[in-house]
Curated annotation (Swiss-Prot):
Its main location: membrane. GO terms for biological process: COPII-coated vesicle budding; ERAD pathway; mRNA transport; nuclear pore localization; positive regulation of DNA-templated transcription; positive regulation of ER to Golgi vesicle-mediated transport; positive regulation of protein exit from endoplasmic reticulum; positive regulation of TORC1 signaling. Belongs to the WD repeat SEC13 family. PROSITE patterns: WD_REPEATS_2, WD_REPEATS_REGION. It comes from Komagataella phaffii (strain GS115 / ATCC 20864) (Yeast). Component of the coat protein complex II (COPII) which promotes the formation of transport vesicles from the endoplasmic reticulum (ER). The coat has two main functions, the physical deformation of the endoplasmic reticulum membrane into vesicles and the selection of cargo molecules. It also functions as a component of the nuclear pore complex (NPC). NPC components, collectively referred to as nucleoporins (NUPs), can play the role of both NPC structural components and of docking or interaction partners for transiently associated nuclear transport factors. Gene3D superfamilies: YVTN repeat-like/Quinoprotein amine dehydrogenase. This is Protein transport protein SEC13. WD repeats lie at residues 7-37, 51-83, 97-131, 147-178, 197-227, 244-274. Disulfide bonds: none annotated.
Amino acid sequence: MVTIGNAHDDLIHDAVLDYYGRRLATCSSDKTIKIFEIDGENQRLVETLIGHEGPVWQVAWAHPKFGVILASCSYDGKVLIWKEDNGVWNKVAEHSVHQASVNSVSWAPHEYGPVLLCASSDGKISIVEFKDGGALEPIVIQGHAIGVNAASWAPISLPDNTRRFVSGGCDNLVKIWRYDDAAKTFIEEEAFQGHSDWVRDVAWSPSRLSKSYIATASQDRTVLIWTKDGKSNKWEKQPLTKEKFPDVCWRASWSLSGNVLAISGGDNKVTLWKENIQGKWESAGEVDQ
């Protein structure tokens, strides 16, 4: 396990490994992003990226077929795109359509191209494609009335390749959006009620098995699992646990294979969960801090 010492001067909000597990990006309330090279249990700070004017909430690596590219989002309402060439990092694009904090960024499945999904406290969700370092005209939709906390892409779907994503907001709702070719925008396909407080995170499982899975984590101290099999058009929900979590559930994250779910909460614990053959979710342990 790699431990990053006092790299930042304030709270660290996100830490993400790149596709190959060789680089780690961290971001913080100190307004900076740090890039580390990872070699076994050793790490070396190689760059500090400065460009945001507020806390940086999240970072996301693009697929390596697009180069060494990182996106970051901040309380300052901006999404910045950073690129490394021959060991030198530069800001290559700025996406600034939002009027309030941008709370999450995620790259689409690489088959769709370098497309970024952004969720903001201004209630809007933006989808923007980057070509040769410059952003194209973004799609901006009204997502959740009081603010959008998170959004997550669906894995590429066969045979129709319809683009979908899920979002969670301060209106306690979870929504699924589908790209409409005729309208050239994303339209609301489903809206789920299940949480009694803000939805803090949403995560669509990358698995392309017979079922689709979405995990939603909430301020109400619950995590819900939404599932849909190929035969049914209806999403079913079940709570991850019978009892509420000890504190707010901040983040939900699937393993690459989509069969293990990690939940991090306000109690500073990360718990792991797996589905059993009866379709019930069981504890798979805790991550040692």
